[in-house]
Design a protein with these regions (language model features):
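Extended, highly charged
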Residues: 1-272, 277-287, 291-475
Length: 475
């Protein structure tokens, strides 16, 4: 099932028993964030949360944790809620090959029902804002998609970027936005500022799950998130034209903010509790001026809790990181079998590969670190043989414990790039990277003294199926 907006997705979650509606009166702080945080502490199958009775707000509706479990992630892809994680990633990979599917332009978006312009804008009146962690420096929009275009090639649809970036609400029509240098919006901004120009942007809030997944997926610079969203949902993605910027925005969004990142203007933004499980301190970041707001009558505000993993961001980013890394590596190294980059935005990746010759696995690990996503995120790579499933952690631990000799199997690369939010980087944005080679050596590599490996007998698979069927029959 393809969802055209957040509301249809919430209804589907509700139909599957994966939306918990909380009708009792709650405080905006700390209850909303604490409840979303708690979903990561109650075991598998955590539901999405819906709040519509929030003390201090008038007629506010807040949704959280919408993709915050593997069940919800499966539903977002139109799969059965019980689809295994590996099945979800395999399906993501299969649909990726449908790219590109051109979007469908639609008229009369619901977000056009109400508009506010210029000095009449007051985001505090329109959005039910609240802090996500006690140490946050302010209110944040952290699940919105930001649309920007290449100032030197504005008509190139593929170079129009849709990405998710944290934004601090700093005034009635003023935001602070963090453009991570490795992300496309940072390149757009750099090109605009070189010309002494502001960078127009459109910010979309309350989106369907597929464009949210795409906003978190590291595509190539000229790959369209809307065309990839069509591939992922297996039907053309619905877009509409934003009235001020003329940008392409999701037809089904709840709220559209349009304005500019002001050229060469920086102010302190932060701190903010980040996906690393640590606060990022205050830093000089860009300033956004909002010039037009369009919003649906009685809009739904969606927010994303971040903190000590696992939280919703890990379910959102996990497959969205594994799949592009796999596709980009597979295109250059057909020997690559699978990529597990589900941990902390892919700061750690586990990659299984066949080996053409000695040293091959290390070359694959190095390439993973220099993909579009790897430049800023892939800090450590564990390379394993093709018969080791990167998603089966006991198998990975076996490979690490039985195949790694620290004397020769650790490749340390000094002074490499990483996003500044990595608390281990020093200075912020620079780190040593590490490849751990847990593969069996092939000629001319002569590490270790490996004998014939123990493998399953031919009858094991049949017996596994038989025992599984017998257990199922007892229930």
């Amino acid at each position: 099932m393809a969802f055209d907006d957040l509301r249809s997705f919430l209804q589907e979650l509700d139909d599957h028993g994966q939306l918990l509606k909380i009708s009792e009166e709650v405080n905006a702080e700390p209850d909303l964030a604490a409840a979303a945080n708690a979903t990561g502490r109650i075991g598998d199958g955590a539901p999405a949360l819906w709040f519509d009775n929030i003390r201090g707000f008038t007629d506010a509706r807040v949704a959280m944790n919408t993709i915050g479990s593997w069940q919800n992630h499966a539903i977002s892809l139109g799969l059965p809620p019980n689809a295994p994680v590996k099945k979800q990633i395999d399906e993501f990979i299969r649909r990726w090959d449908n790219f590109p599917i051109a979007p469908e332009r639609r008229a009369n978006p619901a977000w056009a029902q109400n508009t506010v312009d210029g000095d009449e804008i007051n985001l505090f009146d329109i959005l039910p804002l609240f802090r996500l962690n006690d140490g946050d420096g302010g209110f944040y929009l952290d699940k919105a998609c930001v649309v920007s275009r290449d100032p030197l090639d504005p008509d190139n649809f593929g170079k129009q970027n849709v990405g998710i970036y944290r934004m601090e609400v700093k005034g009635k029509r003023k935001l602070g936005l963090q453009p991570v240098p490795m992300h496309d919006i940072a390149l757009h901004l750099h090109k605009a500022e070189e010309r002494g120009e502001d960078l127009p942007i459109a910010i979309t809030l309350g989106n369907d799950p597929i464009i949210t997944l795409m906003g978190a997926t590291p595509l190539k610079y000229d790959q369209s998130e809307y065309e990839m969203a069509g591939a992922l949902r297996e039907s053309p993605y619905p877009i509409a034209t934003a009235p001020l910027t003329g940008f392409d925005v999701p037809w089904g969004s709840e709220v559209i903010l349009e304005g500019v990142i002001e050229s060469r203007k920086r102010e302190i933004e932060g701190p903010f509790g980040e996906f690393t499980g640590h606060y990022s301190g205050g830093r000089n970041m860009t300033v956004v001026r909002i010039d037009k707001v369009s919003y649906r009558t009685r809009p739904i505000f969606e927010s994303l809790y971040l903190g000590m993993p696992w939280t919703e961001i890990d379910y959102l980013m996990g497959p969205a990181t594994c799949v592009p890394l796999y596709q980009q590596l597979k295109a250059e190294f057909p020997e690559v079998q699978a990529v597990n980059a589900m941990y902390t935005h892919g700061l750690l990746a586990i990659i299984s590969t066949k080996k053409r010759y000695g040293g091959f696995a290390r070359a694959v690990g190095l390439r993973a670190m220099t993909t579009p996503h790897g430049l800023g995120y892939v800090k450590m790579v564990i390379m394993v043989d093709e018969d080791v499933d990167p998603f089966n952690l006991p198998q990975v631990m076996w490979a690490l414990s039985s195949k790694v000799n620290p004397a020769g199997d650790l490749v340390q690369l000094p002074n490499m790039s990483v996003l500044e939010l990595d608390p281990g980087s020093s200075p912020a944005g620079i780190t040593d990277k590490l490849i751990i080679d847990a593969t069996t050596p092939v000629a001319p590599d002569n590490r270790g003294h490996y004998s014939q490996p123990v493998v399953d007998s031919p009858e094991t698979k049949a017996w596994a199926e038989k025992l599984t069927a017998m257990l199922a029959a007892r229930k």
